[in-house]
Amino acid sequence: MKTFSAKPKEVRRDWYLVDANGVTLGRLASEIARRLRGKHKAIYTPHIDTGDYIVVVNAEKIRATGKKMAQKHYYRHSGYPGGIKSLTLEKLLERAPERAIELAVKGMLPKNPLGRAMFRKLNVYGGSNHPHIAQQPQPLKI
């Protein structure tokens, strides 16, 4: 018996709608990353993008355990000496609630062109409205 390898044109992609209201950030991100990679499918092939599309709503209502809202920092650097900036999770959720989920999921995907292709299938929205109604996303409970 030969080992099965999925072909890119044969992969069927579904759309899922995830409500992030009251869900812990890390648990949400790990399940989303698993679905984006396609590891939940029997046809999973490591070098082929077999994942599904994910739409996340209510990103502003995620939870963090412990004191992470005040103590978890996100860093960026301008490239100039002394140009390091930091932002707490609390401030990040005020400014751009989608970004917290995007950063958590991006860190759990491969750091290569295939991982970037997987990340493009993620759509995160701060509120409860989204423009993907035509795709008829199925609700996914996490």
UniProtKB/Swiss-Prot annotation:
GO terms for biological process: negative regulation of translation; translation. InterPro entries: Ribosomal_uL13 (IPR005822), Ribosomal_uL13_bac-type (IPR005823), Ribosomal_uL13_CS (IPR023563), Ribosomal_uL13_sf (IPR036899). CDD domains: Ribosomal_L13 (cd00392). Signal peptide: none annotated. Pfam families: Ribosomal_L13. The keyword Ribonucleoprotein applies. The keyword Ribonucleoprotein applies. GO terms for cellular component: cytosolic large ribosomal subunit. GO terms for molecular function: mRNA binding; structural constituent of ribosome. Keywords: Ribonucleoprotein, Ribosomal protein. It comes from the Bacteria. This protein is one of the early assembly proteins of the 50S ribosomal subunit, although it is not seen to bind rRNA by itself. It is important during the early stages of 50S assembly. Part of the 50S ribosomal subunit. Belongs to the universal ribosomal protein uL13 family. This is Large ribosomal subunit protein uL13. It comes from Nitrosococcus oceani (strain ATCC 19707 / BCRC 17464 / JCM 30415 / NCIMB 11848 / C-107).
